[in-house]
Design a protein with these regions (language model features):
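Alpha-helical and His/Cys-centered functional microenvironments
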Residues: 71, 95, 103
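Single conserved hydrophobic/aromatic residue that forms the stacking wall/gate
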Residues: 99-108
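Conserved anion-binding
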Residues: 87-100
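Conserved N-terminal beta1-alpha1 strand-loop-helix module at the mouth
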Residues: 1-78, 82
Length: 108
């Protein structure tokens, strides 16, 4: 049996039906749900924030892998953790002090 985990991104999903899209991924065998968060600053696109993630929580018990493509990332770690992120992925170049940011993620 493989140890590979399948974590499909919802970035290309129909945002008007995100709950249904996530349930479809779960039925298809996804192990996690990958959620790309973009702020229009660190990257040019804007996607979703903690409020949407908290609403999506009711649609699945699968872990959420929340990929924060935002700056400053440290200001929002707790918000995304509280919203339902199980895994938080950051870009080291988005933080000034990685040695402080990583313990912050571990503490939430």
């Amino acid at each position: 049996m493989s140890n590979i985990k399948i974590s499909p991104s919802i970035l290309s999903a129909d945002f008007s039906k995100l709950g249904n899209e996530i349930q479809s991924l779960e039925k298809a065998g996804a192990d996690l749900i990958h959620i790309d968060v973009m702020d229009g600053h660190f990257v040019p696109n804007i996607t979703i924030g903690p409020e949407v993630i908290s609403k999506l929580r009711k649609h699945t018990a699968l872990p959420f892998d929340v990929h924060l493509m935002i700056s400053p990332v440290h200001k929002y770690i707790k918000d995304f953790a509280d919203a339902g992120a199980d895994i938080i992925t950051i870009h080291p170049e988005a933080v000034s002090y990685t040695h402080l940011t990583l313990p912050t993620i571990c503490s939430v």
